[in-house]
Amino acid sequence: MATRNMIMVVPEEYGFNEHGLMTAVPNSVEEKSYLNLYMHHDGYPEWQGVQLANWRLANPTMDIARASAKLVRDMYYDSSYLYPSVNSIDHQYTYIVWVGKENNKISCFDRYNSKHIFTMTPNEIKTKYADDMDYTDFAKGETRCRRNNTIAKEELATYLSLIHI
């Protein structure tokens, strides 16, 4: 069974108080989210949490609109969809990628158990959850859909052979 998840991208000022403590849950920042990206598979922290940590380390600073667009580009695969609201579709895990001047944190919530799992920096997530898995190497330009340029070249060669070029 798929472990469905939703990724939100939210400005940091809506999630933390003046002491840097998180004060938000997904429903409280729903209207401030620039992105609600549904991912049908692998939502558990050991995969999606680490994937997002790796992505954030490769993309540490950018404005929120650009971060949202790039996250969709880099995370897209054939079972991912954009929704108008975090509550538009059933999913177990909700991730919030916080974007701002001071914050590089990611939060994870388990909706089925009404539980806050973590709010951590990317390195803290990797330390706690990384396992021996074939994570996407965003720092080397990989995306979830295209793991390396060799695949793209092989696909191109296949298409070209079909049209006899």
For the regions a language model picked out, list residue spans one by one:
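Short, solvent-exposed aromatic-acidic interface loops
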Residues: 20-47, 113-114
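Short acidic-glycine loop/turn motifs at beta-strand connectors
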Residues: 10-15, 29-31, 98-102
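A basic- and aromatic-enriched beta-loop-alpha substructure that forms the phosphate/nucleotide-
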Residues: 69-118, 122, 131
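Conserved small/polar residues in nucleotide/adenosyl-binding loops
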Residues: 163-165
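Short, well-ordered loop/turn elements at secondary-structure boundaries
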Residues: 1-4, 31-32
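Short beta-strand scaffold segments in enzyme catalytic cores
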Residues: 5-9
